[in-house]
Every structure is written in structure tokens, then in C-alpha cells.
Amino acid sequence: TACTYNNIPLDHCHFLDLPFYETGKIQKNPISEADVEIVRNLLREVKPHQIFVAGDLADPHGTHRVCTDAVFAPIDLEKEEGAKWLKDCRNWMYRGAWAEWEIENIEMCVPMSPEELRGKRNCILKHSSQMESAPFLGNDERLFWQRAEDRNHATAELYHSLGLACYEAMEAFVRYI
């Protein structure tokens, strides 16, 4: 997996096996109370300082949107209950491969070296669904990793054109409040 590739100890990894995803079909179910509780219990246990979710809310497959909802629904419940751990937590949305955030909306940008970008590609390729042509391309025939790399290159070029430092690539994030 991408976690082992990046030397993340498996006891730091949480595989949720959310019920909405386990349909055996292309179309996934809507999130359920069971999905929300699984994620909420993990958040309460870990009390993360940062959460990163896919912000491709209009991806051709639709799964990113459902996954994002499965994370934000329990966060919103925790907010309503005044969970103290949320005071130190930042929620960041990133884009996958279809489009980048508009520059005026980007709130954090992380530069990547050529080696880091290659590592990102290798992590993407650890997911069997990303190794070949994705079944939900939209209007873009490139492989997922190619689209993601091109997006990261373009973001770095845009920042450089604005007079900022030149990097191989950049990953942009928008904060969810």
C-alpha cells in the first residue's frame, strides 16, 4: 500500500471498511448512520490535528464526494457537541486529478521536489484502480497519475509566474471550516 511505501507503521493506519462502499457495484450507497459512527469513533480515538480529504466533489465517479461527506458529517456532529479536540484540528481538502482550486481560494500550498512527486506517483500506482485507465475519465484520456502530476506541475508554474519560488510541483489545499 501507499502507507508501507512511505514507511508509515501499520499500527498508525486505519482501514475503515465503510458500509456505503461495500456494494460490489460501481454505484456506491449513500452514507449511513453506521458509516458516520465508524468515522466518528475513529476521530474521537485519534483526535487528529489535521484531516485531509478529497475535494473533488464533482469527480466523474462520485465516490470522492461520498467519502468527503462521510468525514464531514461526523465532524459537524462533533462541532455541535463542542468537542474540544476540534479546536486544534484543521480540515484540508485537496484535489485529485480533474481540476485544481482557483488560486484565490487556495489557503495552503505544499511544494514538492522531483523525488517527492515521483513518490506521489508511486503511491497512486499502489492502488490497483489507478494503474490502468480509470473507468471514470470524464473527458480526459490521461491516466489518473498523469493528470495529477500535470495538475501539480501547473500549480507550481502558476505560483512561479506570480513571482514566487520555482518548484517541480505543488499540492494545493482549501480549508474546510
Regions inferred by a protein language model and the residue ranges of each:
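Extended hydrophobic secondary-structure segments that form protein cores and membrane-embedded regions
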Residues: 14-18, 52-54, 89-103
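Active-site beta-strand->loop->alpha-helix modules in alpha/beta enzyme cores, enriched
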Residues: 1-84, 122-125, 141-142, 172-173
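Residue-level detector of functional hotspots within protein domains
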Residues: 1, 37, 96-98, 159
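C-terminal accessory domains and tails appended to enzymatic cores
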Residues: 4-6, 28, 41, 80-92, ...
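A short acidic, often aromatic-flanked loop/helix-cap motif at beta-alpha or helix-coil junctions
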Residues: 19-24, 99-102, 116-118
